[in-house]
Curated annotation (Swiss-Prot):
This is TNFAIP3-interacting protein 2. The modification Phosphoserine is found at residue 7. It is found in: Cytoplasm; Nucleus. Residues 29-117, 196-226, 255-340 form a coiled coil.
Length: 429
């Protein structure tokens, strides 16, 4: 879709709006300066009136009053022009044109995004808006003409004021010359000289005001020129809109339309491919997240299982330790009992064997005494064996090993003490 028609109008619109805003700010600043100057001039006129009333001269009072009335009338006209309807109309016109510019931009964006059958409707609406713009331009032309008429009136008023000031200056010069001639014979020459000086100062002040008024007229002419330039820029913008409308009315070439359609189709395919890639990435991320959650749950379960195993092993170790302590206490008590019984039953044999036996042999004897007849609880099929001749009942078992488990009566050698303790801990559980 081509945007060449009316591109000049789009480029001119921001410049016109910027020029309009600049003009509005400059006009506001100059209005404030003019208001300050008017206030200073009012104070000056009041002082001049007071001095004229104090002088009470006879020379051309009607001219001074007429000049003051003319200045007051001119001040009122200038104040009405600058601070009244002209400023309000200009501000309203600026706001209205700014709003219309924004509306045109929005309408153009909508028009470019709409299909062909809706563009025709937009063309009709744009024609109507163009007619309204022409009516607004006519109204602005009327406003410009009114400003030009006021400018001409101000020029004529300034010219009349200048002539009146010149006439007043001539009259004052003649009076001053006459009073000089008469003052040589008058005793109160000093008082008349003061009066002439004050009148001369009044004339100078009026001439200064005349100069200021001329400057204000120049300022008004400058504003009028800026307003004309703004009208010219607005006309250019309107012509750009007309050209844009003509471009919209002309049907596009089929080749351009096909190119535009193919370009839009490519963009659509690219967007669809991007969406598919994003969906795949999203699915992959979701799968990875689910796998991570499952692994976390599995690890949590493993941690709980390891924790339970650790607690159970710890409880088993504590029970085994307590059981080992109990067995050690029982072994100590049995050793004590065995030694006492052997001393009481076989004093000679006990004394002979006591010197050669160790504490481990005594433990084995004590266990054999607790299980009489050679029967072991761990073997249900074993029959009780008769004791050997010439010895006591545990002699055969002691021949097989030095140490024996008190529960299952398994024998261990002297070097297998640690294995015996482990076996006792496992067997007694």
């Amino acid at each position: 879709m081509s945007r060449d028609p009316g591109s000049g109008g789009w480029e001119e619109a921001p410049r016109a709006a910027a020029a309009l805003c600049t003009l509005y700010h400059e006009a506001g600043q100059r209005l404030r300066r003019l208001q300050d100057q008017l206030a200073a001039r009012d104070a000056l006129i009041a002082r001049l009136r007071a001095r004229l009333a104090a002088l009470e001269g006879d020379a051309a009072p009607s001219l001074v009053d007429a000049l003051l009335e003319q200045v007051a009338r001119f001040r009122e006209q200038l104040r009405r022009q600058e601070g009244g309807a002209a400023e309000a109309q200009m501000r309203q016109e600026i706001e209205r044109l700014t709003e219309r510019l924004e509306e045109k931009e929005r309408e153009m964006q909508q028009l470019l995004s709409q299909p062909q059958h809706e563009r025709e409707k937009e063309v009709v609406l744009l024609r109507r808006s163009m007619a309204e713009g022409e009516r607004a331009r006519a109204a602005s032309d009327v406003l410009c003409r009114s400003l030009a008429n006021e400018t001409h009136q101000l020029r004529r008023t300034l010219t009349a004021t200048a002539h009146m000031c010149q006439h007043l200056a001539k009259c004052l010069d003649e009076r001053q010359h006459a009073q000089r001639n008469v003052g040589e014979r008058s005793p109160d020459q000093s008082e008349h000289t003061d009066g002439h000086t004050s009148v001369q100062s009044v004339i100078e002040k009026l001439q200064e005001e005349n100069r200021l008024l001329k400057q204000k007229v120049t300022h008004v002419e400058d504003l009028n020129a800026k307003w004309q330039r703004y009208n010219a820029s607005r006309d250019e913008y309107v012509r750009g809109l007309h050209a844009q409308l003509r471009g919209l009315q002309i049907p596009h070439e089929p080749e351009l339309m096909r190119k535009e359609i193919s370009r839009l189709n490519r963009q659509l395919e690219e967007k669809i491919n991007d969406c598919a890639e994003v969906k795949q990435e999203l699915a992959a991320s979701r799968t990875a997240r689910d796998a991570a959650l499952e692994r976390v749950q599995m690890l949590e379960q493993q941690i709980l299982a390891y924790k339970d195993d650790f607690m159970s092993e710890r409880a088993d170790r504590e029970r085994a330790q307590s059981r080992i302590q109990e067995l050690e206490e029982k072994v100590a008590s049995l050793l004590h009992q065995v030694s006492w019984r052997q001393d009481s039953r076989e004093p000679d044999a006990g004394r002979i064997h006591a010197g050669s036996k160790t504490a481990k042999y005594l433990a084995a004897d004590a266990l054999e005494l607790m299980v009489p007849g050679g029967w072991r609880p761990g073997t249900g099929s074993q029959q009780p064996e008769p004791p050997a001749e010439g010895g006591h009942p545990g002699a055969a078992q002691r021949g097989q090993g030095d140490l024996q488990c008190p529960h299952c009566l398994q024998c261990f050698s002297d070097e297998q003490g640690e294995e015996l303790l482990r076996h006792v801990a496992e067997c007694c559980q």
